């Protein structure tokens, strides 16, 4: 477990839960968290993020990996394998649900069915990066989260 401070919030960044989610739900060929792309997000009243996907089969990029970062992929692998893709996305809820209204993370599947992520503080959601999702408009308070992506080789 690696603990990190984000402002006055204490969070736990633990690959264990992401690996477990992958084992139990996806079985994707993954390298690691793209550590250079983890983002602290906050939504104040009126803020939102429109419908989008974080990655698709045609969206490749060079990961932001620094030597000695603890990421389980070497720079040689990046150079040999070239580009990678975002395969899993994750969001760690940092705010208490009672501290804000609105700001729900909403998903939509290919059948048009909609789902909402839990809002409890400490909830980690892990989902396929090709899943269409959004953050609905924040109505009051402040919604805080950490979001990031797990990368791997191109889709086969």
Predicted regions and their residues:
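Catalytic core of non-heme Fe(II) oxygenases with the double-stranded beta-helix
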Residues: 15-156
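Single conserved hydrophobic/aromatic residue that forms the stacking wall/gate
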Residues: 1-14
């Amino acid at each position: 477990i690696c603990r990190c401070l984000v402002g006055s919030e204490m969070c736990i960044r633990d690959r264990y839960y992401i690996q477990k989610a992958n084992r139990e739900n996806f079985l994707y060929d993954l390298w690691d968290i793209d550590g250079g792309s983890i983002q602290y997000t906050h939504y104040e009243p009126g803020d939102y993020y429109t419908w989008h996907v974080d990655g698709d089969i045609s969206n490749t990029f060079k990961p932001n990996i620094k030597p000695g970062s603890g990421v389980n992929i070497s720079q040689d692998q990046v150079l040999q394998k070239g580009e990678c893709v975002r395969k899993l996305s994750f969001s760690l809820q940092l705010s208490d649900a009672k501290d804000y209204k609105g700001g729900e993370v909403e998903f939509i599947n290919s059948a048009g069915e909609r789902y909402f992520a839990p809002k409890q503080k400490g909830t980690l959601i892990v989902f396929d990066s090709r899943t269409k999702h959004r953050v609905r408009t924040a109505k009051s308070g402040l919604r805080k989260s950490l979001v990031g992506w797990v990368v791997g080789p191109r889709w086969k």
